[in-house]
Amino acid sequence: MAREKFERTKPHVNIGTIGHVDHGKTTLTAAITMAMAARGGSAGKKYDEIDSSPEEKARGITINTAHVEYETATRHYAHVDCPGHADYVKNMITGAAQMDGAILVVSGADGPMPQTKEHILLAKQVGVPNIVVFLNKEDQVDDEELLELVDMEIRETLSSYDFPGDEIPVIAGSALLALEALSSNPKIGDGEDKWVDKIFSLMDNVDSYIPTPARETDKTFLMAVEDVFSITGRGTVATGRVERGTVKVGASIEIIGYVDTRVATVTGLEMFQKTLEESVAGDNVGVLLRGIQKEDIERGMVLAQPGTITPHTKFEAQVYVLKKEEGGRHTPFFPGYRPQFYVRTTDVTGKIESFISDEGDEATMVMPGDRVKMVVELIQPIAIENGMRFAIREGGRTVGAGVVSSILK
């Protein structure tokens, strides 16, 4: 069967459902796909089609995630939903499914719970920029005042993690009752069912509140170097995949990492043995550089638009440590541990100086399966920025995955 061509007519946005276990994330995901299908978007997905999510690997870690897609009048959405709490932690830290925004699902009957707070904290630290709240199970709350209290509590919780709690849209409803109405009448329209209207309202708010992200090609140029060779009489070629932005022949770029930053001019671009005038995000390209010797550049360095990224050695990161069953360590590790940090295209040795718990206390050791904040000092400077992902490796196997939350030095 021929694959459907992906029609790119509307702007694309990546979102996901986050929140405490059993507050209704998957039910809401199913209700959204069916509500958008009723409005004339793509086909709906039932609860069990979403819940039986396949495993995928990101940075050597197995994660269960369900991906669904749907359309509103103005946008195309890719939506990720994870069945288990550990899958969320792993997904958000590895960036397996990047989120431009999230729908935080909170049960109106229970209010914010420990995982609600943990997901908000993670969203903040891994750089999920915007959150819209769905206050679920409204039908189970008899007292209107109780719902208002939960609304206030969620807003305060969001504000305490530096999200704009007062501005964030909070839509109350019942994902289950909406899903039941949609299952009995898949063509239901606006104004025909109170609960389905709440789902329509939620997505109208997601459309208007979550901004369309900048496209990768509009960002500043960055490419991690994978390989280097020299062409006699022409100069040195660095190959790699353009991570973001665009680069043109004749442009000045910086070479960053390990040693002092150098500036070079791009004298040629090649892809699949053909020359290009310009290369864009996603291209695997050879970049010909003038005035640079083969010894001056190596795998793991990056080429970037001048002044946009700087080399650093010390940072704070949010890290998930693999369990033994996931191929991780069998034993805990302590401050002073020196593994390899695999960043973009290469390993750099680093020392873990300290661990910090969510409460801000210093921890003395980390067990396999833990999520922890740590301070790392690398032995060589490399190009680092907030939100950058990395893997922690020891003897060739992945023992953890992390995301940079702040740069210290």
UniProtKB/Swiss-Prot annotation:
Enzyme class, first EC level, given as a word: hydrolase
Output the PROSITE patterns linked to this UniProt entry: G_TR_1, G_TR_2
Does the record's keyword annotation contain Cell membrane? no
Q: Which UniProt keywords apply?
A: Chloroplast, Elongation factor, GTP-binding, Hydrolase, Magnesium, Metal-binding, Nucleotide-binding, Plastid, Protein biosynthesis
Chain segments carrying region G5: 174-176
| Positions of GTP binding | 19-26, 81-85, 136-139
Q: Which family does it belong to?
A: Belongs to the TRAFAC class translation factor GTPase superfamily. Classic translation factor GTPase family. EF-Tu/EF-1A subfamily.
Give the protein's biological function.
Answer: GTP hydrolase that promotes the GTP-dependent binding of aminoacyl-tRNA to the A-site of ribosomes during protein biosynthesis.
**What is the name of this protein?**
Elongation factor Tu, chloroplastic
- The scientific name of the source species is Ostreococcus tauri
